[in-house]
A protein has these predicted regions:
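N-terminal, membrane-interfacial amphipathic/helix-forming hydrophobic leader that caps
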Residues: 1-93, 244-257
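Hydrophobic alpha-helical transmembrane segments
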Residues: 21-25, 63, 67, 102-107, ...
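Aromatic-anchored segments of alpha-helical transmembrane domains
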Residues: 27-37, 51, 111-119, 192-200, ...
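Alpha-helical transmembrane segments of multi-pass integral membrane proteins
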Residues: 30, 64-69, 77, 109, ...
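Juxtamembrane helix-loop-helix connectors linking adjacent transmembrane helices
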Residues: 42-63, 83-163, 181, 251-257
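Membrane-embedded alpha-helical segments of multi-pass membrane proteins
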Residues: 67-75, 154, 158, 170, ...
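Membrane-interface helix/loop boundary segments of multi-pass membrane proteins
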Residues: 166-190, 219-226
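Functionally important transmembrane alpha-helices
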Residues: 189-192, 198, 204-257
Length: 257
């Protein structure tokens, strides 16, 4: 009985031993570990007590999150492919691909989506959620005093943009291209699932919209053979949302756009 079960298990496992299995299992593990050790909450629990007097103490957990995301989503994903002799020697969408089509499509989507971002930024649901660091994204603390810092905000948004480059590489670069040989265009739908689930906790409309966004960004990456255009689009829209919400604090004497 035990022998037959072992034989059946080996038979099933042999069919799972390709790169798509490494991408699905490894990608899931990377997302889980990053959610714990790479989160802002982890930084607050481990490091914040030791850095309590730092002027940017409210922003530091997010710099940790953005930085560790690059390690988990880019460095470790490629290391995993290398260790398992996957297709790490391929581009994984790292090349520019079809630049003309990518730039045109990304620009059109940027203009079309920016209007929705603008409207959303005027609602309490989104203005109370972004920036993710809230006032910490642009506020320095000096004892009992606080000061708005545009420089801190610029650094925060640069890190935030870098986070989206890593995020897009994981889903539309590494995962999509790793699944493509086995699942064909179905890989677009498969990579959308964990992408959408990672939006749990965000405003409901954004979480639901991530289903459409995940499919659209997957198509864009497949059409252009590059993840860069979706990464720029995703990052630019996220920074735009933060800027709209934080504008009145950063530029109190300048009318809000």
């Amino acid at each position: 009985m035990t022998g037959s079960l072992q034989s059946a298990a080996r038979s099933y496992l042999r069919g799972l031993g390709d790169e798509s299995t490494v991408v699905l299992c490894g990608g899931t593990a990377l997302l889980i570990v990053s959610r714990y050790q790479g989160s802002a909450d982890f930084f607050r629990a481990v490091f914040s007590p030791k850095l309590a007097g730092h002027p940017a103490i409210d922003a530091l957990p997010y710099f940790w999150w953005f930085g560790t995301s690059v390690i988990f989503y880019v460095v470790l994903s490629l290391a995993l492919s290398a260790a398992t002799r996957g297709s790490f020697t391929r581009s994984y969408g790292l090349r520019l691909g079809d630049f003309r089509a990518g730039a045109a499509i990304a620009a059109a989507l940027l203009v079309a989506t920016a209007a929705a971002i603008y409207i959303a930024s005027r609602t309490h649901t989104f203005s109370n959620h972004y920036p993710l660091a809230r006032h910490g994204a642009y506020t320095l603390r000096f004892g009992d005093k606080q000061a708005v810092s545009r420089g801190l905000f610029a650094l925060y948004e640069a890190g935030y943009f870098l986070y989206f480059l890593a995020w897009e590489f994981l889903f539309r670069g590494w995962m999509l291209n790793g699944l493509l040989p086995r699942f064909g265009r179905g890989a677009i739908a498969i990579q959308m699932v964990p992408f959408a689930l990672m939006h749990l906790g965000k405003p409901e409309l954004e979480a639901l919209g991530s289903i459409i966004a995940g499919i659209a960004l997957g198509i864009l990456a497949l059409r252009t053979r590059s993840f860069w255009y979706g990464a720029f689009l995703h990052g630019a829209l996220a920074v735009f949302m933060d800027l709209l919400v934080a504008w009145r604090y950063l530029f109190p004497h300048v009318p809000s756009p």
